[in-house]
Regions:
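Conserved donor-binding/catalytic core segment of Leloir-type glycosyltransferases
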Residues: 180-197, 203-206
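Aromatic "clamp/platform" in nucleotide-sugar-dependent glycosyltransferases that forms part
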Residues: 262
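Conserved acidic donor-binding segment of nucleotide-sugar-dependent glycosyltransferases
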Residues: 294-295, 299-306, 314-319
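N-terminal strand-loop element at the rim of the active site
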Residues: 1-7, 11-62, 152, 165, ...
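Nucleotide-sugar donor phosphate/pyrophosphate-binding loop at the beta->alpha transition
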Residues: 64, 106, 116-134, 172
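Short hydrophobic beta-strand element within catalytic cores of glycosyltransferases
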Residues: 279-282
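Nucleotide-activated donor-binding/catalytic signature segment of Leloir-type glycosyltransferases, i.e.
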Residues: 227-245
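Short alpha-helical donor nucleotide-sugar binding micro-motif in glycosyltransferases
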Residues: 241-242, 249-254
Length: 354
């Protein structure tokens, strides 16, 4: 169940839609997503998908999500409700509480980065944390997708006994190794064009770099109201959201992936890129250092520091990027497999209590 699934949340849902090998007959899955994002769940049978009308993150859309969720809970009688992201978690758990005289599903909640991890005022962080502390009492298991998120949540008062660490995982890729070549260095950004994803940091950094051999492709669009403008720039190509197969093709053509986020749960985009042999140029925010190690699988710069990112873009060279990408591919194979993520998630579905 999700209030919005654009980006990494959709990838996670698609991945865990495949039950553990040999165990598919034990599960019947139903999904609730925005009707204009249903196509993000390609590969999932349409009869399993329920939708609601969403025009943005506004009160009417949130009320429609709550109403549709209550309908699904009453009709489908699920044993487990898995809520993805903060707004879904708040609304979904409130709906479940209201329906408890009639329906009592186990509640699994994955915030994909708690709201109190965002860059915001201390007052807002305290309010967000208070809401999560209250709602944890009606939550059976909270999935944290990074050690950073789990430790930070514990410091904000979320009980460790309710939390379970499950890293996002990715299916292994067996594509041919990249070759250095003599073409310009092709950089890639995939994600929402907003403040959280640090898209403004990337634009400022790229504008500072005095290199004619760099090309940047930006894939994504605004989802929330805090979107960043996309000014026309030399050597920058803007693309809307594309299909997963098209994203894979872009990964294959790129020389490096840029992830300048200000906060993350545990981003799927760098996992996808590393699985394709791409080095990642990432900020040091929240969970990203658990995935990207400086001068090992990519480059790491201080979050929000566009000059530091520009400095990295000034020094990168193709042969070194190839070496970093190959190391990153090995790290993903060893530590972040889809099979492990699926098995751990379904273990919670079977016994989602602490």
């Amino acid at each position: 169940m999700a209030e919005t699934i654009k980006g990494g949340v959709a990838t996670v849902i698609r991945t865990i839609s495949a039950s553990p090998e040999g165990d598919a007959a034990n599960y019947e899955l139903v999904y609730l997503v925005p009707e204009d994002q249903e196509k993000e769940l390609h590969g999932i049978a349409p009869p399993q998908i329920r939708t609601f009308a969403r025009s943005g993150r506004n009160v009417p859309s949130l009320l429609r999500f709550a109403w549709r969720l209550s309908q699904v809970l009453i009709k489908e009688k699920p044993d487990v409700v898995h809520l993805h992201s903060t707004f879904s978690g708040v609304i979904g758990r409130c709906v479940c509480v209201l329906l408890r005289p009639w329906r009592k599903p186990q509640i699994v909640y994955c915030p994909h980065a708690f709201s109190f991890l965002m860059e915001s005022s201390p007052t807002k962080q305290k309010v967000y944390a208070w809401i999560e502390r209250v709602l944890q009492k009606v939550t059976d298991v909270i999935i944290c997708v990074s050690q950073y998120e789990l430790d930070k949540a514990a410091r904000f008062g979320i009980e460790r006994k309710r939390m379970k660490l499950i890293y996002n995982g990715i299916h292994h890729k067996d594509d041919a190794p990249k070759a250095a070549g003599t073409e310009p260095i092709h950089l890639l950004f995939v994600g929402r064009l907003d403040y959280q994803k640090g898209f403004d940091v990337l634009l400022k950094a790229f504008a500072k770099v005095q290199r004619k051999d760099l090309k940047l492709t930006v894939v994504g669009s605004a989802v929330n109201e805090d979107s960043v403008d996309c000014p026309p720039m030399d050597s920058v190509e803007y693309l809307p959201w594309v299909t997963p197969s098209e994203v894979q093709a872009l990964y294959q053509k790129a020389d490096a992936l840029i992830v300048p986020s200000r906060w993350e749960g545990f981003a799927m985009v760098p996992l996808e890129g590393m699985a394709m042999g791409l080095p990642v140029i990432a900020s040091n925010c929240t969970s990203l250092p658990e995935l990207v190690t400086n001068e090992v699988s990519g480059y790491v710069f201080p979050s929000g520091d566009h000059q530091a990112l520009a400095d990295v873009l000034t020094i990168i060279q193709k042969p070194r990027l190839l070496d970093l990408g190959n190391e990153g591919r090995s790290i993903v194979r060893e530590r972040f497999s889809a099979a492990l993520m699926i098995r751990q998630t379904y273990d919670l579905y079977r016994a989602p209590t602490y």
